[in-house]
């Protein structure tokens, strides 16, 4: 039973790729057709690869893997944070700071500073400091929380990285590859899939598409951690829904539409 139905993918707009002139030829085998200058992703393949990604993430979580969710563009930021928190994992949803993984020691020092400022506020230190100094500390804390708040409690370098739009997050992907961290990613038609270990061919520019895929991978983590199928009821319901009978229906849906 597929973890995501064709109907769900269609409704979320997962099939819309980029303009044909912006494509990466290495994504050709994941593209079904082209309509009005837009590539249409083969959702039959998306269903298959989403299943593989789900299994990979579930098995990793069952082995107590630390998973880092990465998505810094506005279409991904909320879903990445919400689903990482829901699944008990960690996230970066603003600008990726170079060296976040490859210079982990320095990042840990900045996180320690963030925690120190928080303690200063909690233990009353702020009350005896000059207002200007408190204002500077609050500004520093806000900046640190913005960029590092999602990994503040991450116990170690992640065992798995999930990325929305690896084309945009190239630095993050390169750091993961350098450290041998497997990367699971939503891969759109403008992206080179070669650096991704577990791909999900999908529209990574639509909020609903990002939310759907990201939530399913969070479900996989929850299932892996619980040691049971925590989303069996939801999956059964999805399977009972009316689904697209064939890939040709996708063409009918997207005829005349643009990304």
UniProtKB/Swiss-Prot annotation:
MF GO annotations: structural constituent of ribosome
UniProt xrefs under Pfam families: Ribosomal_S2
Biological process annotations from GO: translation
Gene source species: Streptococcus pneumoniae serotype 2 (strain D39 / NCTC 7466)
Keywords attached to this entry: Ribonucleoprotein, Ribosomal protein
Gene, per the UniProt record: rpsB
InterPro entries membership: Ribosomal_uS2, Ribosomal_uS2_bac/mit/plastid, Ribosomal_uS2_CS, Ribosomal_uS2_flav_dom_sf
Source organism, top-level taxon: Bacteria
Name of the protein this chain belongs to: Small ribosomal subunit protein uS2
HAMAP family the record matches: Ribosomal_uS2_B (MF_00291_B)
Entry keyword Ribonucleoprotein: yes
A GO term from the CC aspect: cytosolic small ribosomal subunit
Similarity annotation: Belongs to the universal ribosomal protein uS2 family.
């Amino acid at each position: 039973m597929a973890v995501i139905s064709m109907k769900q993918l269609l409704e979320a707009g997962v099939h819309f790729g980029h303009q044909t002139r912006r494509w990466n030829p290495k994504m050709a085998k994941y593209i079904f057709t082209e309509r009005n200058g837009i590539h249409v992703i083969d959702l039959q393949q998306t269903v298959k690869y989403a299943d593989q990604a789900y299994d990979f993430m579930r098995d990793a979580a069952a082995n107590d893997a630390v998973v880092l969710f990465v998505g810094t563009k506005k279409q991904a930021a909320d879903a990445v944070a919400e689903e990482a928190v829901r699944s008990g994992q960690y996230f970066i949803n603003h600008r990726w700071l170079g060296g976040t993984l490859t210079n982990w020691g320095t990042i840990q020092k900045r996180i320690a500073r963030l925690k120190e400022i928080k303690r200063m506020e909690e233990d009353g230190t702020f009350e005896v400091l000059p207002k200007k100094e408190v204002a500077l500390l609050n500004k520093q804390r806000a900046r640190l929380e913005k960029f590092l708040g999602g990994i503040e409690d991450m116990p170690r370098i992640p065992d798995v990285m999930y990325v929305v739009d690896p084309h945009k997050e190239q630095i993050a992907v390169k750091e993961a590859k350098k450290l041998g961290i497997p990367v699971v990613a939503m891969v759109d038609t403008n992206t080179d899939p070669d650096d991704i270990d577990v791909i999900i061919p999908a529209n990574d520019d639509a909020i609903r598409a990002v939310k759907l895929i990201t939530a399913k991978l969070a479900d996989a983590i929850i299932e892996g951690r619980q040691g049971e199928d925590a989303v069996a009821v939801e999956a059964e319901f999805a399977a009972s829904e009316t689904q697209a009978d064939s890939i040709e229906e996708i063409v009918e849906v997207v005829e005349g539409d643009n990304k």
